[in-house]
Amino acid sequence: MIKALIFDLDGTLTDSIIGIMDSINEGLVSNGFSKITKEEAIYYIGDGIKELITRSIAHSREKSKTNLVLDSDYQKVLRIYLKKYQEYRISKTKEFPQMSATLEKLKKQGYKLFVLSNKLDSDVKPMIDYFFKGVFDEALGESPLIGTKPDIKGINYLSLIHISEPTRRRGIS
């Protein structure tokens, strides 16, 4: 019997693409790179912040006939992205229609609800508190403890901490 449900955040619970795109574009343009489009941002997200920035810089460099991404460029874009995304993560994000009602219904049916995201953990928690306060049993984002999906550390952690029956945990390494 299913007792717990794990959700992604971006593109599943919330529409956050505009805030992500605007933040990355401010970092890119400030460092002499070209902007990415919404469609490109959608294509580049999903594997964590490092991949998003690396793909965005490489795309800009392809236009200038080189796709080499230097660590110094990555660090400069990252610094601006992190600052801007703190401003945009709430103001430029929308909860998908009926999501809160659906989650509340699942909660009332006895499911444990979790978020496991490749977004930085420092962004996940404020977003969950703002959009879905009190709904999720735990929300985790990218961190040294969890890593990024498809790494199974996040699922292992949630299973070991929140599923009380030891027999349900046997297959987890």
Task: Enumerate the language-model features and the residues they cover.
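Active-site neighborhood of HAD-like aspartate-dependent phosphohydrolases
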Residues: 1-43, 54
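Conserved hydrophobic/aromatic "anchor" residues
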Residues: 7-9, 81, 155, 162
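Short alpha-helical
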Residues: 19, 48-51, 122-123
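Short helix-capping segments at alpha-helix termini
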Residues: 29-35, 61-70, 108-109, 132-135
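A metal-dependent, Asp-based hydrolase signature
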Residues: 46-85, 105
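Substrate-recognition "cap/lid" segment bordering the active-site pocket of phosphatases
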Residues: 91-94, 120-164
